[in-house]
Amino acid sequence: MERLTDEDGVHARVRQRNVLCGAGKYLTFQLSNEEFGIRVLKVREIMGLQEITAVPQTPAHIKGVINLRGKVVPVIDLRLKFGLAAADYTQRTCIIVTQVQGESGPVLMGIVVDGVSEVLNLAGSEIEDTPDFGEEYSGGYLLGMAKVKGKVKILLDIERVLSTQDLHNLNSMLR
């Protein structure tokens, strides 16, 4: 029989806290053949694809900006941010407008996704910690993995999806 150490107990409590903190409502969406989710409280609006004005000398995943009722909102393509193959935009492609914390306060940011699925109310028991993928991969933007109807949905911390440099670039675009 395997003996548990104090360290094992600490890790178990941390995992339990992470799972309980992850419980709540998530907007789920598709990228390629995968399903992702972000906390509903971070979502401000879901809109159909509209014209995006490109901004020169930005990384490829920063598509540009949109005019949202007189407010300039930066837009990123999550496919490109995650290193997935680029795809043509379709009728289902949409922009999820989220609110993230920028250098000088809250910032609206649009994310282009292949399509929105549904809002799920997830219990802590439906969420598992992110697996350990090894040293090469930090996965700091993953909240966990939700098990729903025999499928896995990847839960994202939208605040951490963008790197510090991305947030700096977005803040510069808005000045």
Q: Residue locations for each model-derived region?
A:
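An acidic, low-aromatic, low-complexity terminal/linker signal
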Residues: 1-175
